[in-house]
């Protein structure tokens, strides 16, 4: 048996583009986006794809074609949205450290809203907007102090986290923002974490934020939208992920008759299970205490296992009638932490292709050049067709900015 992405066998993609190779299913991207649209249809939401999950231009372009808005956290991500044909007027600018240059870029581009996360940021956006003679549409990201029950590195809604304005300080912060002449308050935002597998924290956060919405309205600050962020998890192994329909019903019931536009910022749940990392076995190494399957992908290609001790299902692309072994699936990087899977039972040998599942989110977007390794190519599959959406990086491209400096030094010395 051979594994396929849609109607294309993975070995054909490996032959055409080499490995390691990120492979994405266009139909899976579409299905995930439409799942949100259908589940929340009664609330007519603006679904803003979180670009940080995977910023490939072709993926952004595809979501734009479906009517998606975008959630960005940097000027670079905004540039990607614009380059891919995304609509700035449907783009939310989040993030705790927006520079003046990024704010100016976003104001000139006409983003829908800035999610402000601190008093100093309120001051900075006011300053830049005044200098440009513009009015900045803003909301405040409020930290509801709700435990997302996820990995601590991706929990963002507790008092101890760097994100957002403390719940107890929210009313005061809104009144301060309302006094700024170049800011227009249009919404409220929260985002409590990523890879949530329990619905209750999401509902609790919504409840707490709506209490603030009512308190603000009573004091004359009437909001136009409610941004509940993202965070809905996906299945990597055996997780029970929240049902979007149940989530939508809970949110609809909580919003009730309030006239609030709902904004959602999903990332992982749109792209995570739409992508896989295709890799080839270099060696099988048998040891006294541990066996190792050495592959040509590594932690620089997929950081999640090393960073979060995250699980990704790994399987052989072609079924063979050979003995299985239990081994760690590891890359060639000089780190003991360079692993893609631990203690996996698999049947493979040198030259075989392996598929690392659920790698569409925080895979390519977190890749690096550690050990001077080139970043992987990326392919998008649509039915029986496929196309390259990112060329494999070359050593010349990897070293270009440094070589230019060396050449300039040489010219100056001469």
From Swiss-Prot:
Enzyme superclass (EC): lyase
Pathway: Amino-acid biosynthesis; L-lysine biosynthesis via DAP pathway; L-lysine from DL-2,6-diaminopimelate: step 1/1
Pfam families: Orn_Arg_deC_N, Orn_DAP_Arg_deC
Chain sites annotated for binding pyridoxal 5'-phosphate: 231, 265-268, 362
Enzyme Commission designation: 4.1.1.20
Active-site residues per Swiss-Prot or TrEMBL entry: 334 (proton donor)
Binding site for substrate: 268, 304, 308, 335, 362
Keywords on record: Amino-acid biosynthesis, Decarboxylase, Lyase, Lysine biosynthesis, Pyridoxal phosphate
Cofactor(s) for this UniProt protein: pyridoxal 5'-phosphate
Modified residues annotated as N6-(pyridoxal phosphate)lysine in this record: 52
Reaction equations catalysed: meso-2,6-diaminopimelate + H(+) = L-lysine + CO2
Highest rank taxon of the organism: Bacteria
Biological processes annotated in GO: lysine biosynthetic process via diaminopimelate
One GO MF term attached to the UniProt entry: diaminopimelate decarboxylase activity
UniProt-listed NCBIfam families: lysA
Record function comment: Specifically catalyzes the decarboxylation of meso-diaminopimelate (meso-DAP) to L-lysine.
Family indicated by similarity: Belongs to the Orn/Lys/Arg decarboxylase class-II family. LysA subfamily.
Subunit structure: Homodimer.
Entry protein name: Diaminopimelate decarboxylase
Organism of provenance: Neisseria meningitidis serogroup B (strain ATCC BAA-335 / MC58)
Name of the gene: lysA
């Amino acid at each position: 048996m051979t594994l396929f992405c849609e109607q294309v066998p993975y070995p054909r993609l490996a032959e055409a583009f080499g490995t390691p190779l990120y492979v994405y299913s266009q139909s899976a991207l579409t299905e995930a986006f439409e799942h949100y649209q259908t589940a929340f249809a009664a609330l007519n939401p603006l679904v803003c794809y979180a670009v940080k999950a995977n910023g490939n231009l072709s993926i952004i372009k595809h979501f734009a074609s479906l009517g998606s808005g975008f959630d960005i956290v940097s000027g670079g991500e905004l540039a990607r949205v614009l380059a891919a044909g995304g609509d700035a007027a449907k783009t939310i600018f989040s993030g705790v450290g927006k520079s003046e240059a990024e704010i100016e870029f976003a104001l000139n581009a006409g983003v829908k809203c800035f999610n402000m996360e601190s008093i100093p940021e309120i001051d900075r956006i006011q300053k830049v907007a005044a200098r440009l003679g513009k009015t900045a549409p803003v909301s405040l990201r409020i930290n509801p102090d709700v435990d997302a029950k996820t990995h601590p590195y991706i929990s963002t809604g507790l008092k101890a986290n760097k994100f957002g304005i403390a719940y107890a300080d929210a009313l005061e912060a809104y009144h301060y923002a309302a006094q700024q002449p170049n800011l227009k308050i249009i919404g409220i935002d929260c985002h409590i974490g990523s890879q949530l597998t329990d619905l209750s924290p999401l509902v609790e956060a919504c409840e707490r934020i709506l209490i603030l919405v009512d308190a603000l309205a009573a004091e004359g600050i009437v909001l136009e939208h409610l941004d509940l962020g993202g965070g809905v998890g996906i299945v990597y192994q055996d997780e029970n992920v929240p049902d979007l329909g149940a989530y939508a019903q809970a949110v609809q019931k909580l919003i009730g008759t309030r006239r609030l536009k709902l904004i959602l910022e999903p990332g992982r749940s749109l792209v995570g299970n739409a992508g896989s990392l295709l890799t080839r076995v270099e060696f099988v190494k048998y040891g006294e205490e541990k066996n190792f399957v050495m592959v040509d992908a590594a932690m620089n290609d997929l950081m999640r296992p090393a960073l979060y001790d995250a699980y990704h299902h790994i399987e052989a692309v072609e079924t063979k009638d050979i003995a299985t072994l239990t081994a760690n699936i590891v890359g060639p990087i000089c780190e003991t932490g360079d692993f893609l899977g631990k203690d996996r039972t698999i049947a493979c040998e040198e030259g075989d292709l392996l598929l690392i599942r659920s790698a569409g989110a925080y895979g390519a977007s977190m890749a690096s050049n550690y050990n001077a390794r080139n970043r992987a190519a990326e392919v998008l599959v649509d039915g029986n067709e496929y196309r390259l959406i990112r060329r494999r990086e070359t050593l010349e491209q990897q070293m270009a900015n440094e070589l230019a400096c060396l050449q300039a030094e040489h010219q100056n010395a001469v």
